[in-house]
Amino acid sequence: LGDVYKRQGHMVFSTLHTNDSLSAFTRLIDMGLEPFLVTSSVREVMAQRLVRRLCPNCRQKHEPTLAIREKYEGLAKSFPALFAHEPLFFEARGCAKCQHTGYKGRLGIYEVAVLNDEVADMVLHQRSPAELQQAVRKHGFRDLLEDGLLKVWQGETSVEEVIRVAGQTGIEDD
């Protein structure tokens, strides 16, 4: 039905349950859509997760582990404009205002994959999400983990929270 509206010139927004944005292409094909219909109908896909926001009243500065600092060095090279300022590393402490959780509220972490010609060709040939990720990275793609780590760098959430939500990362505390 969404494809019918799309062909009539209407923009369609939909929800699909996948682990990341790039898996949406595979999921749509697995649901029975022809690859050429996917590539002609989809402009971009976005994955999102909610992480808990550090309580501004009780968050406490801390020094990240070596593994985390090394991960940030790589991110700073890939996204220099985003990681230009000094980091604000905080950890959750807990107080009466946040009911001793260390967190108050939520914020989103996102990844957006744009379907350009190269990616469309890869979807047509049913390439894996890993191969698709290599292609979109050439155009500034940031995955959920990287966007979450940017939010850590900005002092909005903790590394532990991003790991909890975005999954295994190889940067767990030593």
Where are each of the predicted segments found?
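Short, flexible helix-loop junctions that flank or precede catalytic/ligand sites
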Residues: G2-D174
